[in-house]
Amino acid sequence: MKLPKIPLILAIAISSVIPAILNSQSVTDLDGNIYQTVKIGDQTWMKQNLNTSQFRNGDLIPEVKTDVEWEKAGLEKKPAWCYYETNADNGKIYGKLYNWYAVHDSRGLAPKGWHIPSDMEWKALSTFLGGTDLAGKKLKEKGTTHWKTPNKEATNDSGFSGLPGGLNYSFGSFVHQGNVGYWWTSVEDSEETAILFSLSYENSTLADFFLNKGVGISVRCIKD
């Protein structure tokens, strides 16, 4: 039996809807936080920063509320998280800040089916978006609701919606919220440091460098 042909207009309509469906999936962590996802090239990323207080097995990640406790966690190489300036309202927008010991913990920081991206996965993302000098503008949320002016050239063409969550230094000092977004990779640079990627309000670059593992910064997850 001959199958009926799909009218061209209908075919176009269907094809335009499919990407939206693929990009509208979500994942939920053990705290009940729901993360929208976006497909960029061959990768699927969360559109929000991680905000869980539990490892994948249900164990609680210690919350740290003082400078002294934060520095101690880093020195003892123990996992920890905090809100920027210990203000839970910041978590609603920017997620939690984690030290690298939480990222690297064998109990798993990312939800099941997801993981913390390696530096090579970040670099693959950058390459797909046109390289280091162009990727940043395509990854940053548009406008200055959360980013400091001028949030240079931000288009968010990728749908990644990168936010400037700032950081908590290993000795316990909050800086750069509104100015810079930092995200851990799963890869260490040395015994004391690990690799991260960053976006800035001042340029359109996706930069990579390293910081002390006791620093608290944002985390984005990528699908297995």
Task: List the model feature ranges, each with a label.
Residues 3, 23-224:
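Conserved positions within compact, well-structured domain cores
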Residues 1-25:
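Bacterial Sec-dependent N-terminal signal peptides
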